[in-house]
Regions:
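Chalcogenol-based redox active-site neighborhoods
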Residues: 1-150
Length: 150
């Protein structure tokens, strides 16, 4: 996925269900990962310079969200033939490198990304406790942020 204009948030839209493989070799569903007070679904990948620029901050924020009862999950939907850096093996390495405290799932058919209408990486979808969309968009302004060289 490339940098594109994020569509307007359709407030109240329900989260789409999924059943995907995590980097811990577990199949996880939306019901498995939803939080008591909310759920953050992030579409990311390993090779994206924008993801690399903010991944440390994402990891830190997710820990804070957890204290609020908000669970987080990241989904990688890129075609690994076109982006070998995003392979499942590299997802495992990436999640360990950045100490992910949240599940990192592979969507190898892009079915889930299409259901969510994810258009770029990173693309964030924040839901309330009833899994109704409250925010859709970017993490924060990316101007002047440097790519992590790890």
């Amino acid at each position: 996925m490339s940098l594109t204009e994020t569509p307007i948030c359709n407030f109240g839209e329900k989260a789409q269900s999924f059943n995907l493989l995590s980097t811990n070799n577990e199949r996880l569903t939306l019901n498995n990962i939803k939080g008591k007070n909310g759920t953050l679904i992030m579409f990311i990948c390993n090779h994206c310079p924008y993801v690399k620029a903010i991944i440390k901050y994402i990891s830190e924020e997710v820990i804070f969200f957890e204290t609020l009862g908000i669970k987080s999950v990241a989904i990688m939907s890129n075609d690994i033939k076109n982006y070998p850096e995003d392979s499942f093996e590299n997802m495992i390495k990436f999640s360990k490198l950045y100490n992910f405290s949240f599940p990192y799932l592979i969507d190898s058919t892009q079915e889930i990304a299409k259901k969510y209408k994810a258009v770029c990486t990173p693309d964030f979808f924040a839901y309330n406790k009833n899994l109704e969309l409250q925010y859709r968009g970017r993490f924060r302004e990316l101007k002047n942020m440097q790519t992590d060289k790890k």
